[in-house]
């Protein structure tokens, strides 16, 4: 089947037994001036930034009172670090014990991806307001349940896409584009050209590192043997726990790209092409990938490149000057967003015509401050990155990955034939092929994976006519770590 003719498209365009739950009658709302007690759950990586941000909000009445991690060494190190600062925090290994503490008001979640939605839903059900790292979900369905939970229990849930705090550096550029000052949008490109080397390859199951509660680490995911050298971080590249770089670094740029388009639904059609190329290791997710979201307004095209600009190089490619960023191509020029806090507009000749920088600093600190202000006001509309925004951007990553996982290997000639009806897709694929050739990847012997075009009903967030794709919108949860359906 032909992948599409874009012109033609535009013409037609309650919880199970054993599940942890705290009844909402067991909590009460604090007064606006009260101290807000906070906990960070999972801090072997991004959680360190959560600790710093919350600790910096003392003047806003926020107090870090607890830390939670399933790794005893990480937990002890975190508690000791706070102790040296004169801050006494209560250590927890199990998030369920955290949520039983009625004195905790804010739960900040930076666990591996497979825990994000469940931990946040449990926290909301326990009466807590939540800051949850991106992606807010491991799959589409559980992300929607988190949105439903936030609304049902009237809790404030902020997504950790801190670029949304850049109101002058990026937000004003969004307004500039949406007001039509550069003409019609042709395409929005997200790029994640970030070095990702091999994670190595083991020939036997690895021992569980000492001090880790592995049952809790796995949580809702299968409790499988460890088949990689490093338990921590490299879970990003294993489907049961992570979502590849599309759902790791890429979710930030996917979110900015959707922000520019102003889309508040999932795309009606999506497809993917790519693979894990350039080395053989224990990773499962693509290190080279294109995801094409076929919105009626303009396509959102996302690229992941983990290999360098060429074999042996230490540099990465760039697209219109963007390595990890966003490029908005319009009839009258283009805008680049090369960072979390700035944007630049160019005319058709490439001359810079306008530049935006963040006047309030941007990033983590103002994003957390905005979260706390919304906790005080009880208005989720005041959030920079309300959970609905986080769900939609996360789900765009998930649907792209679903196409990849349902794909089949194909020769480059076949791929080019399938997409020849679309100039943007063809140009993007051609650039990816040249990139792989520069890395001496022999595409005659190592084939790319071409995913199917998946049609979606954005209202129901289910695919049309593809039962196999629908199955991947959720997962089989491991008891008792079951994500509840929230009506």
Q: Which residue ranges define each predicted feature?
A:
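N-terminal glycine-/serine-/threonine-rich beta1-alpha1-beta2 phosphate-ribose binding loop
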Residues: 1-132, 141-157
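A contiguous active-site-proximal alpha/beta segment in oxidoreductase catalytic domains
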Residues: 129, 137-216
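Alpha-helix capping and helix-loop boundary segments enriched in small/acidic/polar residues
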Residues: 74, 86, 110-114, 137-141, ...
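Contiguous beta-strand/loop segments that form the cofactor/metal-binding neighborhood of enzyme cores
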Residues: 172, 184, 189-190, 198-244, ...
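Short, solvent-exposed turn/loop segments enriched in Gly/Ser/Thr/Pro and often Arg
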Residues: 71-74, 92, 110-116, 136-138, ...
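Non-transmembrane alpha-helical segments in soluble domains
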Residues: 10, 51, 55, 79, ...
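Structural recognition of the beta-strand scaffold that forms the well-ordered cores
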Residues: 37-41, 45, 64-69, 108-110, ...
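Conserved donor sugar-nucleotide recognition element shared by glycan-biosynthetic enzymes
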Residues: 47, 91, 116, 142, ...
């Amino acid at each position: 089947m032909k992948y599409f003719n874009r012109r033609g498209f535009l013409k037609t365009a309650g919880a199970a037994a054993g599940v942890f739950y705290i009844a909402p009658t067991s909590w009460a709302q604090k007064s606006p001036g009260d101290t807000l007690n906070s906990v960070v759950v999972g801090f072997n990586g991004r959680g360190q930034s959560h600790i710093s941000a919350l600790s910096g909000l003392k003047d806003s009445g926020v107090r870090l009172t607890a830390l939670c991690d399933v790794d005893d060494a990480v937990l002890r190190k975190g508690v000791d670090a706070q102790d040296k600062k004169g801050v006494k925090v209560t250590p927890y290994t199990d998030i369920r014990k955290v949520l039983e503490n009625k004195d905790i008001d804010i739960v900040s979640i930076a666990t591996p991806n497979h825990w994000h939605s469940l931990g946040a839903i449990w926290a909301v059900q326990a009466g807590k307001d939540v800051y949850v790292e991106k992606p807010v979900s491991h799959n589409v369905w559980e992300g929607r349940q988190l949105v439903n939970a936030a609304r049902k229990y009237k809790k404030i849930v902020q997504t950790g896409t801190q670029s949304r705090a850049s109101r002058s550096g990026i937000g004003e550029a969004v307004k500039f584009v949406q007001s039509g000052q550069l003409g019609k949008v042709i395409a929005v490109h997200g790029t994640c050209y970030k070095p990702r080397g091999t994670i190595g390859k083991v020939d036997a199951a690895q021992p569980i590192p000492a001090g880790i509660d592995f049952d809790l680490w796995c949580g809702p995911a299968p409790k499988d043997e460890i088949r990689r050298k490093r338990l921590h971080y490299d879970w990003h590249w294993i489907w049961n726990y992570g979502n590849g770089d599309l759902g790791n670094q890429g979710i930030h740029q996917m979110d900015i790209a959707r922000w520019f388009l102003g889309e508040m639904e999932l795309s009606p059609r999506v497809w993917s092409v790519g693979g894990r190329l350039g080395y053989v290791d224990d990773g499962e997710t693509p290190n080279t990938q294109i995801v094409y979201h076929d919105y009626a307004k303009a396509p959102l095209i996302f690229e992941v490149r983990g290999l360098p600009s060429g074999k042996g190089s230490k540099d990465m490619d760039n697209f219109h000057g963007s390595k990890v960023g966003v490029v908005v191509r319009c009839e009258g020029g283009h805008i680049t967003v090369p960072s979390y806090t700035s944007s630049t507009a160019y005319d058709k000749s490439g001359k810079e015509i306008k530049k935006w920088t963040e006047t309030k600093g941007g990033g983590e600190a103002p994003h957390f401050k905005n979260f706390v202000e919304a906790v005080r006001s009880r208005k989720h509309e005041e959030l920079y990155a309300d959970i609905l925004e986080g769900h939609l951007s996360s789900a765009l990553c998930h649907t792209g990955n679903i196409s990849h996982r349902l794909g089949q290997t194909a020769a480059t000639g076949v791929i080019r034939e399938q997409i020849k009806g679309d100039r943007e897709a063809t140009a993007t694929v051609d650039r990816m092929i040249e990139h792989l050739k520069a890395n001496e990847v022999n595409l005659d012997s190592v084939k790319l994976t071409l995913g199917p075009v998946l049609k979606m009903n954005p209202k129901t967030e289910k695919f049309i006519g593809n039962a196999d794709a629908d199955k991947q919108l959720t997962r089989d949860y491991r008891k008792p770590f079951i994500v509840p359906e929230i009506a």
